[in-house]
From Swiss-Prot:
Belongs to the NAGSA dehydrogenase family. Type 1 subfamily. GO terms for biological process: L-arginine biosynthetic process. Its EC number is 1.2.1.38. This is N-acetyl-gamma-glutamyl-phosphate reductase. GO terms for cellular component: cytoplasm. It holds the Pfam family Semialdhyde_dhC_1. Pathway: Amino-acid biosynthesis; L-arginine biosynthesis; N(2)-acetyl-L-ornithine from L-glutamate: step 3/4. The gene is argC. It comes from Pseudomonas putida (strain W619). It comes from the Bacteria.
């Protein structure tokens, strides 16, 4: 069994990790930390986990206990993993970080977007960006994995086939993305209150969202050149889900885009390219580690529209983290993740 530690288990990504790992036949959660909830039983805080973690309680983070684990997940706000990751890596423990701490390769760029100096720039050279559909072989050999964000996952998977094939104009990319309220986290905030978010939709961070440099970094690597991206996120009155409507200019009308996408993702267990003319729904991926994609060329013109949907807490966070765990430890990539989405 893989001995697992989780730092920061009281947020939505933390409890989603617990839910997924409870179904994993080769992983056992030995340590879960929370300074504010130390001593509280996991099953008392999350009744949905009763019968799965009845002997596990939250504890104050202890480097010795965490270093005894084979792998430690960080489901924490940005900046926390900076302080602990180096010590764990030195002890031989693998680190899978769900926060943004090691996603950007440039420490100065990270500091610009997150408003504080990067706390462990010396570790950036060791960090592998954990998008399996791009970096699977690097993940197998990694010590430190940076799990992609939710918007970046849906957006990159949608654009990748076009950019890798050199078909899309890289200077004219648009990502119009909608997120459920759980993407804002579990902390109390006026904008996340039911009376504020219900029956309403709004754009936010139009001047620049923290996921913009992460998306741009990935698309730039895929295109092999600089890219121009307009990214506009929206908050929608649902709990889970990301819906990305992606626009790219593709002048070559002879290309069979459906075949291109199907070929690119033919061997990917968690990317579902839907039949031509489809419109994927966020509800179809709720609770599942799946990205569903459909590609369109409206009116046969130069503009290509890609629709990409994920569950922000699963393929956009905790599910993708477990997918990385499976790859890292040489397991079947689908282990503990093959359940279907929840309907209705």
């Amino acid at each position: 069994m893989i001995k697992v530690g989780i730092v920061g288990g009281t947020g939505y990504t933390g409890v989603e990790l617990l839910r997924l790992l409870a179904q994993h036949p080769q992983a056992e959660v030995a340590v879960i930390t929370s300074r504010s909830e130390a001593g509280v039983a996991v099953a008392d805080m999350y009744p949905n986990l009763r019968g799965h973690y009845d002997g596990l309680a939250f504890s104050v983070p202890d480097s010795k206990a965490l270093s005894a684990c084979d792998v430690v997940f960080f489901a924490t706000p940005h900046g926390v993993a900076h302080a602990l990751a180096g010590e764990l890596l030195a002890a031989g423990t693998k680190v899978i970080d769900l926060s943004a701490d090691f996603r950007l390769q440039d420490a100065a760029e990270w500091a610009k977007w997150y408003g504080q100096p990067h706390g462990a720039p010396e570790l950036l050279k060791d960090a592998v960006y954990g998008l399996p559909e791009v970096n699977r072989e690097k993940i197998r050999l990694a010590r430190l994995i940076a799990v992609p964000g939710c918007y970046p996952t849906a957006t990159q998977l949608g654009f990748l086939p076009l950019l890798e094939a050199g078909l899309a104009d890289p200077s004219r990319l648009i990502a119009d993305c909608k997120s459920g309220v759980s993407g804002a986290g579990r902390g109390a905030a006026v904008g996340s209150l039911f009376c504020e978010a219900g029956e309403s939709m709004k754009a936010y961070a139009v001047k620049g969202h923290r996921h913009l440099p992460e998306i741009s970094q990935g698309l730039r690597l895929a295109a092999g050149t600089d890219i121009g991206l307009t990214f506009v996120p929206h908050l929608t009155p649902m709990i889970r889900g990301i819906h990305s409507t992606l626009y790219a200019t593709v002048a070559d009308k002879s290309v069979d885009l459906q075949a291109l996408f199907e070929k690119r993702y033919a061997d990917e267990p968690f990317v579902d390219v839907m039949p031509a003319g489809s419109h994927p729904e966020t509800r179809s991926v709720r609770g599942a580690n799946v990205c569903r994609i459909a590609v369109h060329r409206p009116q046969g013109g130069d503009l290509v529209v890609v629709l990409s949907v994920i569950d922000n807490l699963v393929k956009g966070a905790s599910g993708q983290a477990v997918q990385n765990l499976n790859i890292l430890f040489g397991l079947d990539e689908r282990m503990g993740l093959s359940h279907a989405g929840l309907l209705p």
